[in-house]
From Swiss-Prot:
Superkingdom of source: Eukaryota
InterPro entries the UniProt entry points to: B30.2/SPRY, B30.2/SPRY_sf, ConA-like_dom_sf, P-loop_NTPase, SAP_dom, SAP_dom_sf, SPRY_dom, SPRY_hnRNP_U
Chain positions found as Phosphoserine: S195, S513, S721
Cross-link (Glycyl lysine isopeptide (Lys-Gly) (interchain with G-Cter in SUMO1)): K117, K143
Comp. bias regions, Gly residues: 613-626, 634-670
Free-text comment on this protein's domains from its UniProt entry: The RGG-box domain is methylated.
Positions bearing Omega-N-methylarginine: R645, R659, R664, R674
Biased composition (Pro residues): 77-88, 697-720, 776-786, 796-807
Organism: Mus musculus
Sites bearing Phosphothreonine, chain numbering: T210
Location of region: Necessary for interaction with HRMT1L1: 1-103
GO-annotated molecular function: enzyme binding; RNA binding
Modifications the protein undergoes after translation, according to the UniProt entry: Methylated.
Protein name from the UniProt record: Heterogeneous nuclear ribonucleoprotein U-like protein 1
């Protein structure tokens, strides 16, 4: 698929199919789609390799996100056997010497080059380029899409018009609204009716649990762990580049003199971050308790040494040691044999930085300290003692944690064995109802379950700078940052459905469709809904308090829409239990019904996905057009589409009561005679007229008209109507007696108006095949002269045909003022029709008194 040749609509369709964001300019959409395609490519490549040689080891499918194309956090795939170390700069040799890493850099190349590199690969090994025959990978789905593309040399007429019109829409900017916070973007995501794909089962790795390694259960969802469990890196695509990502080791210690090493293998390129982002590449290394979060150094009993040359604990940062960056090796030492204290110190490339922390053993309470790392856009590797030689010299008297007897190591919390043991709690409630407060308290009161809170607030906690939350005085666009955090959350939810953990989904979740959509991927979990529904007075007080603390988070119109659509969950196919925390079910039902009524009264009418005013979209089909305006004609008719490529049912001649469109095919179209068979003011068809690109029929040679017998009664004079006439109303019928045209001969049910005498006469003329004639009231005029308009051929009048005998009905004549009023309204109507200036702008509509439509044609 050549993404650069896709149109904007096609790009959006491809992104929507993958669950990606469809907003942005064409260049951004193409960049996003290319990144998704590159992320999908390794999975297809591995599947083909497995089919070619099923005997190769290590072909377990890597976890790949079901939507969005980004790779899910998990363990990485080892390289095929026989791949030798490749000692190029920026890579590293693994502990067994089989492979080196490089494609961490490649996962973000799409931000700096037009050709998108692989965003997230199964592992960050360095593979020689000649061993990656990506051009041989077969993509049947992509090939099908390429067949549907038009050849680059061919552009239909409408395509060029659309291309010229498109930039004016791309340059429009949405007005900035300061009160678009995290709740607003959660609300927008909940309104989207996506159907999630069922998650694939997580691969079960046969890993020796007695080894000290990175714990895949005690790490962030967006931290990717290699299959050897000694290295990892974070996701960095889009908003993930703002996030810290942490991981802890599987074993800790509480006695002895223990150490481990950490090497920064690469600073991953994140050129999509703004230049104002402070410290886009940082690593913090140290120790923490098993009960601490992954945010190293930002809470008690969490001790870290950062690459900015600072140490931190409980979010208190102090200068310490030297700064460190890519390719530096940091040694971490814990000395439990210093009397009543525990001393933590660090080395940089073998140079001792001094004692960083002294902790009282009583404060620890006999709890073990675990190796811990927190990274931001960096790939790291640990040496717990599995390497034959350390990276750098180790302080005398210290032992690598891997070399300690198993009895002296303390295993961290072990995760659930199956999904049936896992639990997901879905919070349900309006903004500021207290969902986040309840979730934090519940997680703290159940530390053994290690709840992962999935919410925008938790995402923002991982975007801290120097331990401080980003506030609205953030240098960039706050609403853009919040929107990126919401997108990160959506991907984390997809990742979470494949991991055996306990979760709390901290969002509003008031839409019934959102509740169902978010719970279905967690099939097999214990799925529970936690409804926070305070009284209306409490909700108002909490909203005011939250606004004072954080600013206005959700616009009022979004809150009203949530109220109008608030649905209390029920136990059913996607929920095993529903718990009400404040108001119970009966009281909550009454309050929710009140909210529904309040929201429906205050909000706009419900949106319609499709317009019911016509068939098809904008007249592209044969059964009618998607109407740009309301129906203003008689019943059964539509105002017409702008672009009709179909036949009679659209804006062409075959459709009844249409305003008339621009028809590019032969099944209808603008007729040569404007006031002909589909007269605009005809009560039966009410079509304004059609234009046909077909060659004009030449009129017959000029013949003298036969003598006209005097009519028994005057024919119906022209009556005038400025707009669409309802059935039975009077109409202005400009009867034409040109051969080949059909004048309106229907008799209105209400008598029309006859202009006062003396009458006027407009001779018929030919203007480039656009013919119109007027027949004056009796007595009949002499044969009209022929006019020649420049290069247009002379008019050859056809034989005059006398009009049919009129009916015996008489028509009262209106006053001159009424006629002038109708003419003025007719002129005003055509002044508003700026969409068809080539056809109507220079047309002479009679030049009669009171008309402002224009004089004679200047063509």
């Amino acid at each position: 698929m050549d993404v650069r040749r896709l149109k904007v609509n096609e790009l959006r369709e491809e992104l929507q199919r993958r669950g990606l964001d469809t907003r942005g300019l064409k260049a951004e959409l193409a960049e996003r789609l290319l990144a998704a395609l590159e992320a999908e490519e390794p999975e297809d490549e591995r599947e083909l390799e497995a089919d070619d040689d099923p005997g190769l080891p290590g072909h377990n499918n890597e976890e790949v996100e079901t939507e969005g194309g980004s790779e899910l956090e998990g363990t990485a795939q080892p390289p095929p056997p026989g791949l030798q170390p490749h000692p190029e700069p920026g890579g590293y040799s693994g502990p067994d010497g089989h492979y080196v890493m490089d494609n961490i850099t490649r996962q973000n190349q799409f931000y700096e080059t037009p050709v998108i590199k692989q965003e997230n690969e199964s592992s960050y090994d360095r593979r020689p380029l000649d061993m990656e025959p990506q051009q041989q990978v077969y993509h049947p789905e992509l090939k099908t899409e390429m067949k549907q593309e038009a050849p680059p040399s061919f552009l239909p007429p409408e395509a060029s018009q659309l291309k010229t019109d498109r930039p004016q829409f791309q340059n429009r900017k949405r007005p900035f609204e300061e009160n678009r916070g995290r709740g607003y973007f959660e609300h927008r995501e909940d309104r989207r009716g996506r159907s999630p794909q069922p998650p694939a089962e997580e691969d079960e790795d046969d890993f020796d649990d007695t080894l000290v390694a990175i714990d895949t259960y005690n790490c962030d969802l967006h931290f990717k762990v290699a299959r050897d469990r000694s290295s990892g890196y974070p996701l960095t695509i889009e908003g993930f580049a703002y996030l810290w990502s942490g991981a802890r080791a599987s074993y800790g210690v509480r006695r002895g003199r223990v150490c481990f090493e950490m090497k920064i293998n690469e600073e991953i390129s994140v050129k999509h971050l703004p230049s104002t982002e402070p410290d886009p590449h940082v690593v913090r290394i140290g120790w923490s308790l098993d009960s601490c979060s992954t945010q190293l150094g930002e809470e008690p009993f969490s001790y870290g040494y950062g690459g900015t040359g600072k140490k931190s604990t409980n979010s208190r940062f102090e200068n310490y040691g030297d700064k460190f960056a890519e390719n530096d090796v940091i040694g971490c030492f814990a000395d439990f044999e210093c009397g009543n204290d525990v001393e933590l110190s660090f080395t940089k490339n073998g140079k001792w930085m001094g004692i960083a922390f002294r902790i009282q053993k009583e404060a620890l309470g006999g709890q073990a300290l675990y190796p811990h790392v927190l990274v931001k856009n960096c790939a790291v590797e640990f040496n717990f003692g599995q390497r034959a030689e350390p990276y750098c010299s180790v302080l005398p008297g210290f032992t690598f944690i891997q070399h300690l007897p198993l009895s002296e190591r303390i295993r961290g919390t072990i995760g659930p064995k199956s999904k049936a043991e896992c639990e997901i709690l879905m919070m349900v409630g309006l903004p500021a109802a207290g969902k986040t407060t309840w979730a934090i308290k519940h997680a703290a009161s159940n530390p053994s379950k290690k709840y992962n809170i999935l919410g925008t607030n938790a995402i923002m906690d991982k975007m801290r700078v120097m331990g401080l939350r980003r506030q609205r005085n953030y240098a960039g666009r706050w609403d853009v940052l919040i929107q990126q955090a919401t997108q990160c959350l959506n991907r984390l939810i997809q990742i979470a459905a494949r991991k055996k953990r306990n979760y709390i989904l901290d969002q509003t979740n008031v839409y019934g469709s959102a509740q169902r959509r978010k719970m279905r991927p967690f099939e097999g979990f214990q799925r529970k809904a936690i409804v926070i529904c305070p009284t209306d007075e409490d909700l108002k007080d909490r909203t005011v308090k939250r606004t004072d603390e954080e600013g206005k988070d959700v616009p009022d119109h979004a809150v009203l829409e949530m109220k109008a659509n608030f649905t209390l969950p029920d136990v059913g196919d996607f929920l095993d239990e529903v718990l009400f925390i404040e108001l119970q079910r009966e009281e909550a039902d009454k309050l929710v019904r009140q909210y529904n009524e309040e929201g429906r009264k205050a909000g706009p009418p419900p949106e319609k996905r499709f317009d019911s005013r016509g068939g098809g979209f904008r007249g592209r089909g044969g059964g009618g057009g998607f109407q740009r305006y309301d129906n203003r004609g008689p019943p059964g008719g539509n105002r017409g589409g702008f672009q009709n490529r179909g036949g009679g049912g659209g804006s062409g001649g075959g459709g009844g009561n249409y305003r008339g469109g621009f028809n590019r095919s032969g099944g209808g179209g603008y007729n040569q005679n404007r006031w002909g068979n589909n007269n605009r003011d005809n009560n039966n068809s009410n079509n304004r007229g059609n234009y046909n690109r077909a060659p004009q029929q030449q009129p017959p040679p000029q013949q003298p008209p036969p003598p006209q017998p005097p009519p028994q009664q005057p024919p119906p004079p022209p009556s005038y109507s400025p707009a669409r006439n309802p059935p039975g109303a009077s109409s202005y019928n400009k009867n034409s007696n040109i051969p080949g045209s059909s004048a309106n001969t229907s008799t209105p049910t209400v008598s029309s108006y006859t202009p006062p005498q003396p009458s006027y006469s407009q001779p018929p003329y030919n203007q480039g095949g656009y013919t119109q004639g007027y027949t004056a009231p009796p007595p009949p005029p002499p044969p009209p002269p022929a006019y020649n308009y420049g290069s247009y051929g002379p008019y050859n009048p056809a034989p005059y045909t006398p009009p049919p005998p009129p009916t015996a009905q008489t028509y009262p004549q209106p006053s001159y003022n009424q006629y002038q009023q109708y003419a003025q309204q007719w002129s005003q109507y055509y002044q508003n029709q700026s969409q068809w200036p080539p056809y109507y702008g220079n047309y002479d509509y009679g030049g009669y008194s009171g008309s402002t439509q224009g004089g004679t044609s200047t063509q």
